[in-house]
């Protein structure tokens, strides 16, 4: 059990939407105010590398090795447009049906992972751009690792890889992480 607690520390959790995250493979989005599907975002590869590196370093400091996976990052990117919209709805910067949009995001990520014969747990959050630091990531890990660990355990996922999709919009850094087998 101690190993699992250490493993949980390697997972970034959702500072804004953690309580609504579930294992990938969710039930699809609704039609009213649902996921956009066509919204596009520009991924920030430099920030993605920083985000993944921070998670890998943190995990290594807790005895866990997570391999960076471009395939898992691409799965995270599949849900990124809807995650941005959902978090904007949550913080009052957009209108719409948060649950439907978030459901659309998790379905897109789950489908992408499934097509690669992978399973994973997503975690998403947004920081003000000035707050996107390694220290902030560590504080997030410390605050939410227990919840993420529960999701990994319940989904029977042995974390081996990490991927992320990151974009910057209106002074916020939006991050979707996926920890996968």
Segment roles from a protein language model:
Residues 33-107, 162:
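Short, well-ordered surface patches within globular domains
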């Amino acid at each position: 059990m101690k190993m699992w607690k250490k493993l949980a520390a390697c997972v970034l959790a959702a500072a804004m939407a953690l309580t609504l995250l579930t294992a990938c493979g969710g039930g699809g989005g609704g039609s009213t105010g649902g996921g956009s599907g066509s919204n596009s975002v520009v991924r920030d590869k430099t920030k993605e590398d920083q985000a993944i590196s921070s998670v890998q370093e943190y995990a290594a400091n807790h005895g866990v090795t997570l391999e960076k996976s471009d395939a898992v990052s691409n799965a995270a990117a599949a849900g990124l447009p809807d995650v941005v919209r959902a978090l904007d709805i949550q913080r009052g910067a957009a209108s719409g049906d948060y649950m439907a949009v978030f459901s659309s995001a998790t379905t897109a990520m789950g489908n992408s992972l499934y097509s690669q014969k992978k399973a994973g747990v997503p975690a998403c959050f947004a920081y003000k751009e000035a707050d996107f630091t390694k220290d902030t990531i560590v504080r997030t890990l410390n605050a939410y690792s227990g919840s993420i660990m529960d999701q990994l355990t319940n989904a029977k996922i042995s974390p081996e890889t990490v991927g992320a999709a990151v974009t910057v919009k209106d002074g916020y850094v939006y991050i979707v992480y996926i920890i996968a087998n």
